[in-house]
Every structure is written in C-alpha cells, then in structure tokens.
Amino acid sequence: MSVMFDPDTAIYPFPPKPTPLSIDEKAYYREKIKRLLKERNAVMVAHYYTDPEIQQLAEETGGCISDSLEMARFGAKHPASTLLVAGVRFMGETAKILSPEKTILMPTLQVECSLDLGCPVEEFNAFCDAHPDRTVVVYANTSAAVKARADWVVTSSIAVELIDHLDSLGEKIIWAPDKHLGRYVQKQTGGDILCWQGACIVHDEFKTQALTRLQEEYPDAAILVHPESPQAIVDMADAVGSTSQLIAAAKALPHQRLIVATDRGIFYKMQQAVPDKELLEAPTAGEGATCRSCAHCPWMAMNGLQAIAEALEQEGSNHEVHVDERLRERALVPLNRMLDFAATLRG
C-alpha cells in the first residue's frame, strides 16, 4: 500500500519579497518591456493573481489577463513566437506543452505553487498505482510530470462539470492535489472521489471566525469564495467559483459591497468589472494569529517589472521554460481532453 505524501508536514519556504521600485524605475522598465515585446515578437500572458501593475502592462501591450484555462487557450492561439508567462511555473510548463514551437519565458523559473510542491510525482505515481481502477483527474496546478500520469487535467472553472460527466459514466476518481476543491466538487456532484491532500497556502489561510466578524461588520456584503478555500469558508459564500467566475458573480450580484476570499490580485480586474462596488479582502489571520500569505501568493509577487525586462532581454536557461519531449507528449493528452471538454461547454 502506498503512503501518501503529507503536505501538512512539508515546509514551503517563501521566497524573499522583491525589492520595491521607485516611480522612475517602474516607468523605465515599463517602456523597456514594451519595446522588447515588439522586438521579440512576444506577448504577455498574466494570471489574475499577479500584481496590478503587471496586469495593467499585459492589457496595454495586447496580452491576456485570465485564469489558467484561458491563459492556455490564449497562448496556444496567439501568433506571437514568444510567450512571456507572468504566473507560476506550472503555467509556463502548460504553455510549453501546448505550444512547443514557441519560446516560453518567465520572469523567474523559481515561481512555485504550493499545490504543485505538495504533489511530488514519485509519491503521486505510487498513490495512483495503489488504485488502478480509478480515473486520474489532476488540477492544472501540477507539474508536467504529474499531468503526464493523469487521464484528465482540469481547472476550477470546469471542475464540477467534468466530474459530473465522469460520474455519469460510472467512473471512480482520483483527484489531486487540492483537498478543498476536491471536497467541494464531490459535494456538488456526489461522485466517488479519492482526494490527494494538498492545499493552496493562500486559500487555506482564510479563517471562519474572522470572516464571521467581518460579515457582522458589513451585513449588507455578499461573500465570494474560491473553492480552494476550506469547507467552512465555502459554506458561508453567496457565490463560489473560479477567478473568472467570481468576477462574473461580482457583476451579477446586486450587492454594492463584496467580501472576496481569494488572492487579492483579483481585485484589479474585479474592480474594473464593478467600478462602483466596494471590495473587501476576506481575513487570513485568526484571533491572536498572523497570516503567512496574507491573501497574496508570494511566488506570484515575484513577477516584477525588472524580472520581466530581464527575461525578455537575456537569452538562456534562467528564464526559458523547457519540457522533455516525451513528457510533453504524454502531458498533452489530458490537457487536450480538458480543452476539448471545455469547448463543448462553451457550445
């Protein structure tokens, strides 16, 4: 019998915070990046959780700001020969898997994800080997090696629909790596799901008691929650969904005040969508406690202007994403299944 890797006992040392830039330095790097993007026939693909100034730059240069599913779609279809991925490492790997002919650059290759780190491929392979009768579904927040072992890759925006589909076929599921999202999907679908026990270091920190106090302070506010959050937080939500779904919910809900339980990087695009509404961060620190992530992924914060400029300017392995070709071919199969399934949902 396999022994599951225990993410709760793993230590994820946070990267050092980037050195703040002056106003003049920011202006210098912004202009430099714009010039280099044109010179390299490159386009920026940025996640909602990157810092606002990075998202703004992606907008201004014709790039993409989105969740991981749309990032994958956009990068594969865009004619640029180089993709600058502002996000975390698995997003760069996914871009390379889908677009092997393109040069994939990242501000740094040290941008990790606690869900990815919490699902080592050797332990995960052993876990799957112990349950050969189950269909393996892995979240996009995993390494190329873990994706290569999977039958399906999925993002939070289509997780419920996919598991509902597989359940209708009578399939039993291994779900990895996020235990909270897995529990949410199981509750929504009633599927037979065996969960890996990983968690996002941002969403796992949201605290029920502190959120209750904030709700009491603002009783007219709606609560928006990402399903990577603990079940008790999800149970308090007026809307639950992926990043793009939460932005849509912010627009659809009649409330003028919204408490948002996800990475605060989302506030940039959410505030654009609802400029007249007040957005409040859900608390990540309990009574007498301090937060580690404080509602912002420390690795997402590594996607700074200076690092992006260096990635575009410097050639070499410090910034370019590579995926072994045999591994890429194996990981491409479940990724294409995800994209094909998502296309059927869009009609």
Curated annotation (Swiss-Prot):
A Pfam family the protein falls into: NadA
Cofactor: [4Fe-4S] cluster
Pathway membership: Cofactor biosynthesis; NAD(+) biosynthesis; quinolinate from iminoaspartate: step 1/1
Superkingdom to which the source organism belongs: Bacteria
Compartments, record wording: Cytoplasm
Signal peptide: none
Keyword line: 4Fe-4S, Cytoplasm, Iron, Iron-sulfur, Metal-binding, Pyridine nucleotide biosynthesis, Transferase
The enzyme's E.C. designation: 2.5.1.72
Binding site for iminosuccinate: 47, 68, 139-141, 156, 226-228, 243
GO terms assigned for molecular function: 4 iron, 4 sulfur cluster binding; metal ion binding; quinolinate synthetase A activity
Binding site for [4Fe-4S] cluster: 113, 200, 297
SUPFAM superfamilies the record matches: NadA-like (SSF142754)
Main location as per UniProt: cytoplasm
Iron-sulfur is among the record's keywords: yes
Catalytic activity annotation: iminosuccinate + dihydroxyacetone phosphate = quinolinate + phosphate + 2 H2O + H(+)
Note on how the cofactor is bound: Binds 1 [4Fe-4S] cluster per subunit.
GO CC field: cytosol
Gene3D superfamilies: NadA-like (3.40.50.10800)
PANTHER family, per the entry: QUINOLINATE SYNTHASE, CHLOROPLASTIC, QUINOLINATE SYNTHETASE A
Family: Belongs to the quinolinate synthase family. Type 1 subfamily.
Function: Catalyzes the condensation of iminoaspartate with dihydroxyacetone phosphate to form quinolinate.
Designated name of the protein: Quinolinate synthase
Name of the gene: nadA
